[in-house]
Amino acid sequence: MSAIRILRLAAGGDGIGKLDDGRTVFVPRTAPGDLVEPAGLRTHKRFARARLGRLLEPSPERVEPRCPHYVRDECGGCQLQHVAAPAQREARRGFVGEALRRLARRDVDDPPLVPAEREFDYRTKITLAVSADGRRVGLHRYDRADEVFDLEWCHITVPELMELWQALRRLRPLFPPRLEGVVLRMGREGGRHVLFRTAEGEVWGGAAHLHAELRRRNAAATLWWQPSGGAPRAMAGADEAYPATVFEQVHPAMGDRVRAHALDALGAVQGRRVWDLYAGIGETTAALARAGASVESVESDRRAVAEAESRGPAARRHAGRVEDVLRELKAPDLVITNPPRTGMDARVSEALERLAPERLVYVSCDPATLARDLGRLPSFRIAEVRAFDLFPQTAHVETVVVLERAS
């Protein structure tokens, strides 16, 4: 098979090259400029996929990955550890620009990107899977999502959580039975949390023992238990009721920068009616209320809404899916929306198009669903696009788009 020069990176992180017949071929674990010999070619009508067989000529953009799991091609959590940081950032800028041009049909350049202060050791949450036979707890393989490998250390997660994981690994016999998943999380105050997700069954009675063993190893953490279909319960370690399952940014420092930029882009809010959609635990809602806005806040996770209410300040908070709550909201002057990776429901886009607020600030963690939603908002023009590097070593990127009502 002929050698292939990798031209650029695709949105999922795979390298893109060309076959002799002109078809595009996607090759994971390659960098722009690599000359590679592909293996396991699988052809389709318009494109092909292959594995990296041999690296014939490494690109100047290629670096040695830090993570042994990545080197062994085990882990699917990172896609770009083999690519130098500047080239990663350039690729993520391109992912956003390409999606907006190709999918949303918007005439925009690749946006500027605000770099992260840390390229590694930044995630304050990691979700671990359990193998079908219950013997392995770790992450999914990058090429086999149905397989789980035992995690030793994740290099994009904060060391405080990985040190906790080293202690937990040695205490596996004390984990609850019928385990389905484990979440490690560090709060802003520095406290560590472990959430054990299990199949339905009797209440976990071993939390106190595991907590004592962790303390003996200087690895204290609040332990939570959540049976399938049930609410999480704090079982040992702290009295606070703060739910370990509500959404928070996994890269808090960069998340704060995203929020600050989004609020600034919204403009003056004193005396204005503002919708905060997909509001999470209400940090944006609180900032808007403190600035004098009349805020309508919507969040589907009732635990997050309760946490937001406990933090204040006053706002009209609605617990429910945005598309179901719209009819209860008063027409907005301004809107900020921060949906999950799946983007906004079509009914939400249709309502925003009909109501036509003066300005809409869209915070997105997926360029493709962002572009889809912008395609449903033709009466708004793009005033600004800015990307934020919340997820170094991966193909993911956060984007803030400022939309203004076209006159």
Please place each PLM-identified region on the residue numbering:
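Terminal RNA-binding accessory module
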Residues: M1-R72, P86, R144
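Rossmann-like S-adenosyl-L-methionine
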Residues: R5, A11, L174, G201-S407
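Extended interfacial segments that mediate partner engagement and assembly in macromolecular machines
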Residues: G53-P68, R72-L179
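Short, solvent-exposed loop/turn elements at beta->coil junctions and helix N-caps
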Residues: P112-E119, V182-R185, G229-G230, R386-L390
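A short, glycine/Asx- and small/polar-enriched loop/turn
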Residues: F120-T124, G190, A395-H396
